[in-house]
Amino acid sequence: MRNLADRLGIKAPSLYKHVKNRQEIETLLAAEALKEIGEALASEPNLDRIGEAYRNWALANPGLYRVATTRPLDRENLPDGIEDAAAAPLLAAVDGDRDRARAVWALAHGLTLLELDGRFPPNADIDAAWRAGLS
């Protein structure tokens, strides 16, 4: 909380004038991440480009990515339709096949976290792994 307050230029206790608790902050950040991810993917025409956009967004925003994808999601307090909007480009790229969309998202999420955490060997061709997974 202190780091967030410092970045906002306020004292940590002042955060609670705007939000109830840490969970509300995480929900607001997750909502922002979902909005941004959806926007990043929206103009991409195919699965390869969607994967590239997803990866690039996550690598450029690792903290926000982690808040949105590695904690329980407080769906009851997210803005209506935000998850659907974020998923729409992927769902369109797989012709509405929700099972395939979930599998592709799981692959993309796993590859992304492994890359963010430095878990691939130094000589690994991560681009090739993405291409193989999305083909």
PLM regions with names:
Residues 47-63, 102:
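Amphipathic alpha-helical segments that line or abut small-molecule/effector binding pockets
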Residues 105-123:
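Amphipathic C-terminal alpha-helical segment
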Residues 7, 24-43, 49-53, 67, ...:
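Alpha-helical structural segments
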Residues 40, 57, 93:
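Short alpha-helical functional segments enriched in proximate histidine and acidic residues
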Residues 1-24:
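Helix-turn-helix
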Residues 74-103, 124-135:
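Amphipathic alpha-helical packing segments from all-alpha helical-bundle domains
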Residues 65-69, 76-77, 120-124:
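Short, hydrophobic secondary-structure boundary micro-motifs
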